[in-house]
Structures are given as C-alpha cells and as structure tokens.
Amino acid sequence: MNSQQFPRQAASMPSPQVSNSGASVGQNVQGQGDEVARDMDVQSRDLLGAGTVLPSRDDKQEPVVVRPYPQVQMFTSHHPLQPAPSLTMTAQPAHLTSAVPLSFSENILKQTSKSTMPSRPIAPAPPSAMSAVPKVSGQGTVTMESGLPQTSAIPVATISGQQGHPNSLHHIMAATNVHMSIIRSSAPGPPLHIGASHLPRGAAAAAVMSSSKVTTMLRPASAQIPSAAAAQSATQHIIHPPIQSRPPVTTTSLTPAVVATVSATRAQSPVITTTPAHAAEPVLRPTLSIQQHPPPSAISIQRSAQARDAATTRITLPTHPALGVQKPQLHAMTQKTLFGTGNPVAAATVAPILATNTLPSVTTSGSAPHTQVPTSTIVSMTMPTHSSHATAVTASNIPVAKVVPQQITHTSPRIQSDYGTERGNLIPIPGHRASPNPMTMEARSENRQPVPVQLQYFLPTYPPSAYPLAAHTYTPITSSVSTIRQYPVSAQAPNSAITAQSVASTVHLNQMQLINMDTSHARHIQGIQPAPVSAQGIQQSPFSAQGIQATPISTQGIQPTQMNTQAIHPATSITNQGVQTSSVSSQQASSEPKASVVLAEGATIVANPINGAFNATPGGTTVMQSHSQSPGIGSSPAQGSSPRPSILRKKPATDGTKPKADLHAAVAPGVTGDPGIADQPSAAASLPSSHHPAAAVPSPPSQPASGSMPSSIHITPATIPALSAPPPLLSNAPSGAVMPEAKVKEEAEPMDISRPVSVPLLPPNSISSPLTVLANNISIPVGELLPGASPRKKPRKQQHVISTEEGDMMETNSTDEERCHAVKPLTSRPEKRKSPPKEYIDEEGVRYVPVRPRPPITLLRHYRNPWKAAYHHFQRYSDVRVKEEKKLTLQEVANQKGITCRVQGWKTHLCAAQLLQLIKLEQDVFERLTVLQEGLVPKKKTATDDDLHRINELIQGNMQRCKLVMDQITESRDCMLKVLDHKDRVLKLLNKSGASRRLSKVKQKDKM
C-alpha cells in the first residue's frame, strides 16, 4: 500500500527506522536498510513501515519501529537486507519524536509505485505537508515515528477520522489520542475517513482511500519536519489532502508525540486504549499494543503540539528490552512508534487486524522486554495495501469502511492481564476513519500475556472458510488471549503472532483478520502484516515475542524476517497484479521458506495460502499470487487503480485470474499440508490480503533476511511480477504484522467482500508453512468465493451484496467500541455497523459485549406487494376465457354415481306431491268462497244493495282465480310427471352402457 500511496515519494520513506532508537537504530537500520530497500522496491509499503518497521518486526515481534528497544540491534544481522536502495534512513533519534523522514530513493519509490500501481493516484505528500497534514489537521495524525516509517504508512488511513484529537485522544494514549478521537467520533473527518480508513499502509494509502479520486497524494514523510516529520515520516503518506474528507485520517504519523502516557491512556478509553489507537488507528492500534506491553508508563506517547494538525503525535512506547531494544529508550519507542512496522497496519482497513495482539504477549514473562511490545507491531496489520486500496478512496462508497474493525479489542482484555494499565492495545481506533475498516487496530498490545503461542490459532484452520463467514465475526483471535476467541472471521489471529514468539511465527491470525474484510475488504486487508511477524516468530529468540521480527534475527540469523518483503505490501504490487509477489518470499534467499506470502490481492488469494507457499520454499515468494483479484481485494487497487473501492475497481489485465493461479501454485508447494497448521503464523500473514495486498505482503516478512531481502524481493518478482516493489513495504508491515490481532471486522457479513481476504502471513521461516494457510483465509469477503472464483465477477457481486446487506454494512462501519458511523461508504452505509459483534474485555476488565443494532420495527419492512389481489380483476377481455362446458357421453353419464336414483325421478315426484297440496289448498278456499257467495246472494232481487253487490263480485273473482290456479298447477304437475314417462327407456340405456363397468367390478368382487 505504501508504495502505492507513496509511490511518488521516493524520499518519503523516512529513515526513521534507523532512527528508531539508538540501539534500535542500529538494528533497525540494518533491518531497515533491507527493509528500506525492500520498501523502495516495494515502495508500496514503504511508508508503511519504512524499513524500520519491518526490521523491527524481524526482530521478532516488534517489527515496528515503535519498539524503542535496541531491538534493532538484533536486526543488525539484517543489515544485509539493507541493500535497500538509496533509502535513506535518517538516523533520527530513535524516538518517535524524530520525524525521521524516511527517504526512499525516488527510484525505488517510483519504481514501486509504477509497477505496483501506476494508477494509484496517491502521491505522497511532502513530508512537511505530511506533518501538517493539512487535511489531517484535525486528524490525529499520528506521525509514526520515523522509525516507524513503516508504521506511518499505516496510520494513514487508519486515522482517519480520529484525529481528534489531541486531547482526548492523547490521553488515551497519546498516540491513541488521535485515533481515539476517531473512535470517539472525533473527527469530523471521519466521513472522509471512511475511505481512508481502509488504507492500510500509510497515509498514502489512506489518501487513496479517502479520495475517490486519485487525487490523494501522500507525501513521504521524508521531508517532513523533524519532529513532525518523524512522526510524520511514518505517516508521511498521509493521505491528508487526498484523503478527501478524511485526510486527517490518513495521517500516518503514529508517532504522535506521546501526549499522554500510553499507559494511562489505557484506562482512558476502553476503546482506544492504546495510544496507538490514535491516528493510524489501525496503525496505532497495533502500536498501542506495543505500548501495552511495556509498563504503561513507559509508553508515553507524546503528542507534539503540532501533532494535532500534523498528527505528529509521537508515541513513545515504553521501551522494553523485550523489544530487543533497550528498555531505556522509552522514547526510543519512537522507533517502535506505533509499530512503525505495524503502521502499515494502520492502513485503516486493516486495523481490525490489529496485529496488536499478536505481539503483545509474546513475552510471557513480565520481563521488561516483553517482547510484547512488539506486539504493537502487530499493527503491522497494516493493511497498507489495503489502503492503497482504492477502497479508501471510495471512502464513501466503499464498504470498506465497513470494516470498522470491531476492534479486536476484545482481546484486549486478555492482554490486559499482563499490563493492566496499558490499555493501549485496546485501542479501538474504531473511530478511525469511519473507514470501513477502521483499523480497530486494537493495538491490544497483547499485554495479554504472552501466552504466546497459544495463538496458534492456526486460523488457517478455518481460514478460508471462516472469513466469508461471518464477517462480523472475525475470529479475532486475539492472540493475546490465548484464547482464540474464535471470532469466526476475525483475523485476529494476530495473537498468535505474539505468542509465537517461540513459536515463531506465532502465526498471525491475520488470516482471520482478513476475514472480515468482508465487506470492506479493507478490513481484510487488515491484513496486517502480522504474518511477517509470525514468520519471524519462528525465531525462537525471546524476541519471539517480538514475534517475528526479532526472531528473525535471533533465530534466523537470517533475519529472514525481513519483513521487508512484506513490504511488498501487496498493496502496491499486488494491486496490480494482486500479485504482490510477495517477493518477499523470494527473498527467501534465506532459506526461510518464509515465502512471503503475498497475499493475493484479491479475495482470490484467499484460498491460496500463500504462506505455505512461501513457507515451503523460501523462494516461495511465489506466493505472490497476485491474484490480482485485487479489485476485490482490498489490496490497493491494483495498479494505480483509482481509489475507488475495490469492488468497483476494474481489474487490470494482470489482475486476472492468472495471478491467482500463481498464488495457488505457490501455496501448494510451500504450504501443502501445512497450511492448516503452520498457518498460525501464516494467519498473521494472512493479513487482510484482501485489503491490501500489502498486508498480504506482510507474509513475506518472513523472508530471509538480511541483505538479500531487498533483492529477494526482486527475485520474487520473477515469480510474481507484481511483486516488485511491494516487498519493502511489506517489510514494514511486518513489524506491524506482529499485531495480527487486528480483527478485521468481518464487517461485512456477506457483503464484506474484502473481509474474507486474509493475507497469509508469511510466517517465520520456520513457521512458514503455517503461514500459507492464512493465505487461504484471504478469501474474498464476499461470498466466500472459492479461490477459483473469478475476481472479475466477485467484485460485482460484492458490490451488490454491499448495497443489499444493511446489517453488514453497518457493522463494518462501527468500531468495536462505538459504532462509528463516521462515514459509511455511500454504497454500504448500512453495512458498516456490523463490525461490532465481538465481545472483548479490555485491560481494565471491562467487558464489552457487542450489541447488534436492531433495525427499527416496521410493518413495511416485511410488506411485499402481492399480485394476489389482482388475480380476479381483469383489465382486458383477453384476460378472461369462457370455460367450455364438457359434454358427457352416455357412457360417462351411465357411470355416474347414483344415476339410477336420479332416473327414478324422486325429486320430480316430491315436487309433484307438493303441487298437489297447493291444489288441494286452493280447492278448499274455492269451496269456502262458494259457500259465502251463496249466503250473501239475496234471494230476492227486489232490493239491490250496492255493498252486497260489490262483495258478491269480489267473491266471484276470487273463485275464478282459485279455479285458474288449480287448473294451471295441475297442468304443470302433469307436464312435470310426463318426464318420467321415459324412465324405463332411460334405465334400459343406462344399464346397457353402464353394465360393462359395473359387471366387471362385480365380477372382480366375486372373484376376490
């Protein structure tokens, strides 16, 4: 995504990563270098995590730069990866504060952007601008730390509407603050945000999202103001302007100065909980998580004053050794900053993923390090690609927003356990951007304890299927809790990432995450990089918490983690092809199979577990499926596609099914059987591929490490054309990846097309196979399309679904905590709401139970205008046909029941008898009248009496009438009875014709 977003911004990629922190820097830098290179290549993701993030992730968990800890050092090994092209890392302070602008060589950026999404109109905003993020202004732009560059990417969309800031948000966590606001309602921007929200990776993504038009430009943070810049860098691509209304959202900078200590924030709002929440919401969330782990206090997120507008907010995560980086550096956190890596997650869409959880618990122990911190990383979730996703752009129509992650947050509760205070991970970020996929980053921090592995979700298991399934449900597995909260869909898995630690890979549930995407694929995108982490996770090292990232270092020496690959962030490349190449995988050079999975862009990808693929072969990268499905996928719209929602997006030629095939193939090899299992990590990877391929990319993280990384990306390319630039982005993502938690909302239930998509993560090298499974998850949100389904059709279907399914839409829209209606995509406004259905307990033990808004009760709702009433009313003569009477044959008449009785004429006789009675009555009257008449007639006619005469006449008349009646009735009766004269003949005929049948029956009875 980043690259998409920032393609133009070569410089943009701030080195911040390097800056991450002193020690970190070293490590980061190395990692970053690679990452950067990768980013550059990928460019797509570049903002996402700018190299930093990725490396961080490699560390193990803490992909995000945010981790202030020296983690980076671990990455040192990664250095080789450094190869990234000129990516310049500023050696800014590790702190977030430094806004280290990441510089990507223009070439790389361009390259990436070109290859990936030429179309993507998003241009990175100049770093300064970034800072300013004019659009964002309200936005809580959180600047990701420079270290987080990667992160920054995420923030972009994520923030989206959060902005808001500063105050409340920061409280929440400084970082959070921004997002918080989003969550809250905050930002006016939200409407815009919606679109942006999705964007997973960086502001750019957000921008894309936000503005329908390409218009959005993200500027790289690089130039940005130092402070702001630092934050910004990550953000840099803030979408701000492009973002349209929600520019702010874009704000990437997670970094917000920590205005408040994260720890405190936690309490502040369950939702936000973590600082990360703010700005990049998605990103942040992850960040949040990160913060979580460390002591609350440690995390202090500062928000620069300017932060509000610039969203420079810095987040300082607590430094935790766990991170690998030295604890001391609290601010180092900058590095961590919100998961620089995670940032990508920020891509709003992904937020749900919230890798966050993944990291968090990595470290079980309370030890300071708690790799957990990396958890934040999870944020990686970064949907970056997502962001790219046109989806954002569509903001309004895109359902994406739907995604509204429901905040994986629920997991948070679990997390909470470890660090009660830290709330960060909760960070719902829901508000953010209304984006459908609000990231919900739920940084979750995973304070949860490490419980690490637990995750293991293996979302994969259900991966593909689940997604489509309930968008709402998100399986979010919240990794932290070991529980797998199996929200069906939720990509949640992230946790696993965290736990992975040892597990390595820790699978990111990502795939779950994806799921949601539902609708908005944005969500899926969500994607979250987690995968990467998970891949890394493999590393046993304690980092494991760090999850992947660190792990790479440790375990892999290779550092395969190099999420860079991840950087791939499919968004960019994928978008085009969907491929996303996952070059990461190729990176594989290391032996890691990590194969980046890139998740395929499209839902298509879903099936493919890329991960596995790459697991299987490091090169695997193959995964890349570009499955360009992209359109469907949240992944950035392919190729410069417009911001329009993926659903609407036209598929690039590349997009066609072909990539998909690749994907599958890749997967098969790598994954093969594994998917189900390995996937754990993979899940992370699974990240919402849909949303942003970038996320998908994350899987690559695993890819090998060191130096090769950058190149590896390239290598992958062979496999996956699209791949090219994305990897770097990816890498950033990885750190974020760690936070697989983000659950993608499954937002859209049926509709959510994106949701299903999960990007498989590329799990840690070792884990790799698990990863693959995730990829599968990626299925298209919409209809759980089969992997085979053609992407082309899907989108249309999705759109339809979106418009039809109010519930889904609504859900997506809202965030976990509060349904953020912020901006529902025009098309799917109703759907947004669905996201929420997830239950979670925040760190403070407050239990949030999603309440599904019930539609108003209306009789009309179920009223259908039936045609029944018109059935008997005819409008033209032709409508009526006179029924012809059937003439019976003698045979038929003879066979009628009771025919003989009728022939006897009993009715006629009955009637005749009654007529006879009438005649008798008349006769009686006649006789009486006769008697009366005789009595009245004077015997003597001498005296004529008029009265008597008159009476006499009347009697005479009545007598005549009686005679007449009697005669007529008698006649009628006689005529009537004459009918019976033929009775004998009729009986004869009937017996003849009816005999055969009757006789046969009689005979049969006799025989019986």
UniProtKB/Swiss-Prot annotation:
The gene is sap130-a. Residues 1-31, 618-644 have a biased composition (Polar residues). The lineage of its organism: Eukaryota, Metazoa, Chordata, Craniata, Vertebrata. One of its GO terms (cellular component) is Sin3-type complex. Residues 35-44 have a biased composition (Basic and acidic residues). GO terms for biological process: negative regulation of transcription by RNA polymerase II. This is Histone deacetylase complex subunit SAP130-A. It is found in: Nucleus. Acts as a transcriptional repressor. Keywords: Nucleus, Repressor, Transcription, Transcription regulation. It comes from Xenopus laevis (African clawed frog).
